[in-house]
């Protein structure tokens, strides 16, 4: 489309919206919907505020025909998919009042409710996160929790939850936790093969579902799993121990255990990030990870990743890239570093002893690969601090084990690292634990060097959303 055609089309649409009779209404809607299925068409409507308002008025004046309403919602969903201008126009037009009215009027119509939720999801972000949208969205989700055997509804439910969490608004996050609107994801989502089969069978038997073949369903569910984990990551980023305790009381450790039994490398990476975030909490929060066997499961998974990185074990997936493995290694190192830092001595012993010191070797190799890791700067302080605590807390055998396995050589190579903190931390650990005594730096504590030792301030590393896939 060029500008002249755009202008002529918008003029025609304006005329039809004003002059068109009831009989023409469906034809007009179909034309508009078809236009929005192309990127050019989707962006077209943002060029004329009056046209968008006329479309909204046109849709709003025809609420008594469920077919028309369904098409109207589909048009709004398409128009607002990636078009910020249209979102702003409809937002200012107070389109939420239309959503509320339609929701009440067609509460039993599954397809209409699904599209209301999908439309709302497009308005739930940092730019449009006003209370009237948030509260309405939360209330809708609460009222629809028993309908998640409908795949389309479940998709909409997950997307709107993700968009709510992604606002990073503390009050919204607290409301989500208070209302426990995330809980069905922990209970009913098909994470393993058995549950997937049952879930797939239930969707085939549901008349309101669009039939999706099994392979497509598996791919969609895999993408949705990543979104679900990211929802919990954003909830755990809330720096309020009372609310983190509520998540723990609702069974988040058991949920993490489910995730640790899956083999997808992106799930592994994001699951360890959840462990890392919980480990910043109180001793009670950390203890919950031990008491629910989460740490033991995490140790087993870390072994698989470590061996895959060293090409000894293909248990994860023969097609995973080194980049994915390094991303997982970073999150595993962060999680175990914070666990070691924030755990009592007796809790650390099994981690240190696991598989003849595998975690020590994993942390050592993380330092060795530090310049290849994604977001290197986020993790370095915690790994050094963990090693410092280990060397301070345990006997000479630990030092001998590390030295025998090349730890000192790794530190020596890092002495000339371009990151000043890396070289200083390496120097401090060598001087205090591996020097022959000729250097008089033993009174320097690593905390004097690590500028990022206030873990509460550093907790809010943004969730890595690179592997999100749009699954509307």
Sequence positions of predicted segments:
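Buried hydrophobic core positions in alpha-solenoid tandem helical repeats
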Residues: 12-14, 54-59, 98-103, 137-142, ...
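Positions within the helices of HEAT/ARM-like alpha-solenoid repeats
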Residues: 24, 68, 112, 152-153, ...
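Short coil turns that connect the paired helices of HEAT/ARM alpha-solenoid repeats
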Residues: 18-20, 61-65, 81, 105-109, ...
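HEAT/HEAT-like alpha-solenoid repeats
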Residues: 9, 52, 96, 137-138, ...
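Alpha-solenoid helical-repeat scaffold
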Residues: 235, 281, 285, 290-291, ...
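Elongated alpha-helical scaffolds that mediate protein-protein interactions in large eukaryotic proteins
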Residues: 1-9, 25-26, 37-52, 82-94, ...
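Alpha-helical solenoid repeat architecture
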Residues: 1, 15, 26-41, 70-84, ...
């Amino acid at each position: 489309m060029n500008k002249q055609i755009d202008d002529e089309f918008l003029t025609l649409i304006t005329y039809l919206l004003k002059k068109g009779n009831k009989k023409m209404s469906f034809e007009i809607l179909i034309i508009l919907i078809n236009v929005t299925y192309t990127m050019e068409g989707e962006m077209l409507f943002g060029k004329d505020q009056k046209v968008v308002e006329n479309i909204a008025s046109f849709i709003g004046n025809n609420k008594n025909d469920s077919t028309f309403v369904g098409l109207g919602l589909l048009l709004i969903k398409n128009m607002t998919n990636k078009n910020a201008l249209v979102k702003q126009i409809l937002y200012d037009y107070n389109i939420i009042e239309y959503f509320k009215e339609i929701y009440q009027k067609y509460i039993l119509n599954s397809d209409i409710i699904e599209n209301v939720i999908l439309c709302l999801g497009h308005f739930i972000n940092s730019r449009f996160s006003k209370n009237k949208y948030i509260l309405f969205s939360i209330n809708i989700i609460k009222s629809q929790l028993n309908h998640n055997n409908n795949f389309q509804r479940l998709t909409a439910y997950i997307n709107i939850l993700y968009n709510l969490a992604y606002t990073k608004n503390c009050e919204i996050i607290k409301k989500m936790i208070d209302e426990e609107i995330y809980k069905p994801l922990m209970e009913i989502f098909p994470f393993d093969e058995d549950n997937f089969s049952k879930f797939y069978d239930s969707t085939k038997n549901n008349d309101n579902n669009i039939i999706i073949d099994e392979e497509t369903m598996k791919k969609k569910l895999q993408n949705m799993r990543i979104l679900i984990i990211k929802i919990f990551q954003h909830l755990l980023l809330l720096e309020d121990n009372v609310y983190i305790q509520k998540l723990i009381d609702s069974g988040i450790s058991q949920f993490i255990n489910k995730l640790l039994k899956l083999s997808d490398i992106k799930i592994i990476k994001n699951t360890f990030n959840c462990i890392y975030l919980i480990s910043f909490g109180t001793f009670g929060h950390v203890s919950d990870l031990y008491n629910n066997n989460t740490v033991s499961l995490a140790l087993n998974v870390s072994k698989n990743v470590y061996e895959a990185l060293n090409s000894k074990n293909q248990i994860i997936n023969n097609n995973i890239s080194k980049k994915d493995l390094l991303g997982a290694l970073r999150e595993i190192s962060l999680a175990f570093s914070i666990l070691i830092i924030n755990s009592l001595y007796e809790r650390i012993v099994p981690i240190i002893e696991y598989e003849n010191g595998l975690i020590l070797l994993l942390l050592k190799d993380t330092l060795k690969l530090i310049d290849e890791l994604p977001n290197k700067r986020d993790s370095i302080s915690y790994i050094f601090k963990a090693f410092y605590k280990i060397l301070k807390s345990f006997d000479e055998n630990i030092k001998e084990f590390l030295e025998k396995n090349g730890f000192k050589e790794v530190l020596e190579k890092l002495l000339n690292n371009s990151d000043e903190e890396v070289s200083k931390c390496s120097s401090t650990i060598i001087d205090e634990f591996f020097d022959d005594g000729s250097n008089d730096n033993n009174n320097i504590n690593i905390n004097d060097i690590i500028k990022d030792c206030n873990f509460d301030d550093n907790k809010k590393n943004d969730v890595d959303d690179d592997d999100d896939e749009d699954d509307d």
